[in-house]
Amino acid sequence: MKALSVIHSTTSTDAEIPSTGSTKLVQQVCTTNPLHTTTSIDNHHADCTDGTAYNVPIQTSPPRKRYRQCGQSPSQHLQHSNPSIPSIPSASVDPGLCGVRTNSENCNKRRNHCGSQATPVIHLQGDPNCLKCLRFRLKRNCSHLFTQVSSTWHLTENDCTRDTKTGIITIHYYDEAQRNLFLNTVKIPSGIKSCIGYMSMLQFI
């Protein structure tokens, strides 16, 4: 086996080493930074056929951070970073299944947005005596234009006191067509306010 003498230094060092029939020039560079240590070897045998194993460190760099593009949603960024994750459609929920009004500018208050279990109603607010007289006339002359009418009721504050002196009655209808017929037939007195809406029908056991 050939004797090999290596001179270590913090700077470049050239050493001539005698050998049989040839002179080998070994250059070894050692730096103080272990992350960027490189070793260069000059030998007559470029394919390292002299039986000596050389370990040359390979410098690696950390993976680059992927930045999200401006205007890109988190789901799209996640889909772009990992193609194996399926994309989520923006309109995957049917608004008709949950009774949510999607158009904020829709002013059609006579349309049912609460599901099929709600019944169309009209709330009438005004003086309690006027509401009682109106309810009596409706039962006597227009009973075919609604299904039920409530007694006079009112709203209270959290301390169980009335917020106003006005009363409210609620009129129920079979469907929207019957309610529209009621509105086109019955004239609401000027001192009474009306509010169109829907209410869920409760079944008491």
Swiss-Prot record:
GO terms for MF: DNA binding; DNA-binding transcription factor activity
Compositional bias segments (type: Polar residues): 7-20, 70-82
Disulfide topology: none
Protein localization: Host nucleus
Function (record text): Plays a role in limiting the replication of viral DNA in keratinocytes. Recruits the host NCoR/SMRT complex to viral replication foci to mediate repression of both viral replication and transcription.
Gene3D superfamilies with a match to the protein in the record: 3.30.70.330
Keywords, alphabetical: Host nucleus
Organism superkingdom: Viruses
GO cellular component: host cell nucleus
The keyword Repeat belongs to this UniProt entry's keyword annotation: no
Keyword set includes Nucleotide-binding: no
Coiled coil: none
Disordered as annotated region, ranges: 1-20, 59-87
Biological process terms in GO annotation: regulation of DNA replication
Database matches in Pfam families: PPV_E2_C (PF00511)
Protein name per UniProt: Protein E8^E2C
Protein family per UniProt: Belongs to the papillomaviridae E8^E2C protein family.
